[in-house]
Design a protein with these regions (language model features):
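Active-site acidic carboxylates
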Residues: 1-89, 149, 155, 159-163, ...
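Short acidic/polar active-site loop segments enriched in Thr and Asp
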Residues: 41, 110, 137
Length: 170
């Protein structure tokens, strides 16, 4: 019997309209909301989560834009997804979440679909981490519900995931 999970990656204000938002990310919001509202799968979501010390971290030194500081409006889920706030979620201070990957294994999911932002950073990192922890789980990414930092980096990430046996839904 199939046990399905929809993983919504980092659909937070700072990635859509805030510090790191871009037109590509804003453009997929309606697709993401539609997918969330019509899925028959369980739903989990991730929150990129940093503290005030973000500028002193390795990521902060390489990407010196404060974002997703816990407790700020930028850290929160976008308003269109507030209705899933009570779902299981994972705060992560890095691109991928090993806790999410372990949880998927413990819950016995057989299929995991990822949607969200950014394709070329956190979506690919979580897809690959989940794949490493759960090699027999069917993993897919809905390209129309993801966006990258740039259109080219989005495409490159999708191609990389496809090469690692992650199904890409165009």
């Amino acid at each position: 019997m199939s046990k399905k999970l929809l993983a919504v990656i980092d659909m937070q204000n700072d990635f859509i309209t805030g510090a790191l938002g871009n037109a590509q990310c804003r453009a997929v919001v309606s697709n993401v909301v539609k997918k969330v509202n019509h899925t028959d799968a369980d739903i989990v979501y991730t929150l990129d989560t940093h503290g005030e010390d973000y500028p002193d971290t390795q990521e902060g030194r390489k990407l010196p834009v404060k974002h997703c500081i816990k407790g700020t409006p930028g850290w929160e889920l976008i308003p269109e997804l507030e209705h899933i706030q009570e779902k299981t979620h994972f705060e992560k201070n890095t691109f991928g979440s090993t806790h999410l990957a372990e949880w998927i294994r413990k819950q016995g999911y057989t299929e995991v679909e990822l949607i969200g932002v950014c394709t070329d950073i956190c979506v690919i990192s979580n897809a690959m981490t989940i794949k490493a922890f759960n090699p027999e789980v069917e993993i897919s990414v809905d390209a129309g519900c993801c966006a990258g930092v740039t259109p080219q980096s989005h495409k490159t990430a999708l191609d990389a995931m496809k090469g690692c046996q992650i199904r890409i839904e165009e």
